[in-house]
Amino acid sequence: MEEYQIYLEIDGSCQENFLYPLSFQEYIYGLAYGHDLNRKVSILVENVDSDKKYSLLIVKRLITRMYQQNHLLLFANDSKKNLFLGYNKNFYSQIISDAFAVIVEIPFSRQFISSLEDAETIKSFNNLRSIHSIFSFFEDKFTYLNFVSDVRIPYPIHLEILVQTXXXXXXXXPFFHLLRLFLYEYSNWNTFITQKKRISTLSKSNPRFYIFLYNFYVCEHESIFLFLRKNSSHLRLNSFSLLFERIHFYAKLEHLVEVFAKDFSCTLAFFKDPMIHYVRYQGKSILASKNAPLLLNKWKYYLIYLWQCHFDVWSQEGTIRIKQLLSEHSFHFFWGGYISNVRLNFSVVRSQMLENSFPIEIGMKRLDTIVPIIPLIRSLAKAKFCNILGHPISKPVWTDSSDFDIIDRFLRICRNISHYYKGSSKKKGLYRIKYILRLSCIKTLARKHKSTVRAFLKRLDSEELLEEFLTEEEEILSLIFPRASSTLQSLYRDQIWYLDILFSHDLFNYE
């Protein structure tokens, strides 16, 4: 981020189009190739046939020839390797894709926005809220939570919709023209864009850039949904008796008479409280309501029309299924390399009146998030942070890095896990995962300095150095959309998903 700020200070007049020149900066491809903003990667200009080394000159030629008429010679699909040019096409395409990911994430990072003078100070969520929910869903208690709508986010998505959606948030026309060319050349990389089979946004074959595009697309979908939800209270109907003179409401009125024949003369109370609770996980999302299924049916058609009209994505009614939420239901989520287990608990509250001595029992349904300690330990064991029993071990492959980089990597993973699971009411499992990562970090540092853990702790003030493992973070590095000039856009642009959870490294590819 320091390199980006220095670049902007050199030429402040080009801040609107600063993304395009970054495409030709050497350190961008070094950062993208290393997948770590804290790692110093050298630019290698020899052995271009190797899959582990690359030439910056060839990367620049690829970008330049994308504008030329003969660029199809560079991206021919007849073989994996272009014998005429002598380099691996897919390898350099991967580098360009990762570089685009690094560049396009810059204007959406919290650190970059806070560095601008006119940036708006945005407070982070409190300690009792987790990051996988836009609205209060997991952490709140509801007296009546009866119906759940399981929504499958539609795909494939047209490439032009992706480019226009990303261009609307960051005004850098030259960069997005280059991005459009790149997407059309490599649209067959990702099943999310071209094929209609089950989406797998976190597959190892998917580049980091397409993960960003997918989350950005879902983010746009959720931001519009958030806008509709905020304004739905102005559209609610307190009584249908005021609508008798309107002809186009007769059909709805007749339908309601059939369903609610006995209560037709009364005010329909479920229109007064359009409470919708939302959470997204993997390629799906959930809408939950404590009202009758009629409200979810209305939102069902809202979303279908939204996808068809705004995103040009054809969606059928089967993509949204409404079902009744029972007490034995349990939800299992897997997103971003993390697993959540949400159970619906039924509790009874007993109260007693003072004057009249009789008990009153009120049943309440409560959703609690649970930290899945066993799957997390398996994930840590797979990433070589501990053994299968959960005993911390050192990370030998990281001993070549500096002490600061080693600690930063462990802290980043620990921070992301904390962001995801700290909404749970029971944090004992979360503290155990933090302990494993903390001790694994100490063992890795001791192994690097060829010392024992006890001797290393005596020589170094570990309490001051590693205190972040045990403290809750007050500020969250999140993805914030800048406020648009339009009043309409400012109504629904909110903090709705987090960028830092994508960089969980070894835990990211958990299966």
From Swiss-Prot:
Keywords: Chloroplast, mRNA processing, Plastid, RNA-binding, tRNA processing
Pfam families: Intron_maturas2, MatK_N
InterPro entries with a match to the protein in the record: Domain_X, Maturase_MatK, Maturase_MatK_N
GO BP annotation list: mRNA processing; RNA splicing; tRNA processing
A GO molecular-function descriptor: RNA binding
Subcellular location(s) per record: Plastid, Chloroplast
GO cellular component term, pick one: chloroplast
Major localization listed first in the record, in broad terms: plastid
Claim: tRNA processing is one of the keywords in the record: yes
Similarity-based family: Belongs to the intron maturase 2 family. MatK subfamily.
Function: Usually encoded in the trnK tRNA gene intron. Probably assists in splicing its own and other chloroplast group II introns.
Identification of the protein by name: Maturase K
